[in-house]
């Protein structure tokens, strides 16, 4: 054990619980900062925007130290600035070595943050590949743009 590893042993169970609580609070603060919400840390969740609430949910998911984060339509209802903030958070999550699975209709976001994309049309897989491959795929163009114009 290192110097701080047994500090809770000297104070008994209550000291250990306090040390763990302090660690959890510090981790929560770090994750709130990580998703860009440091300025609203003390606000009630009912007073922050829906985009900020989604970022807070991402921070909450990250608190469990997962290997995979699943984001189901995280950009729904977001304006361009909020989508850009979300894209930056997703990129930083990936830089931490976490896998991110995004289900999303906003193709700009998908093209920006994903290395590999699977495209579904009415529940059927019609394409899979890198963003640049998906953008040129005739089945994707037909399904989502109604053909080449």
Which residues make up each language-model segment?
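Glycine-rich phosphate-binding loops of nucleotide-dependent enzymes
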Residues: 1-149
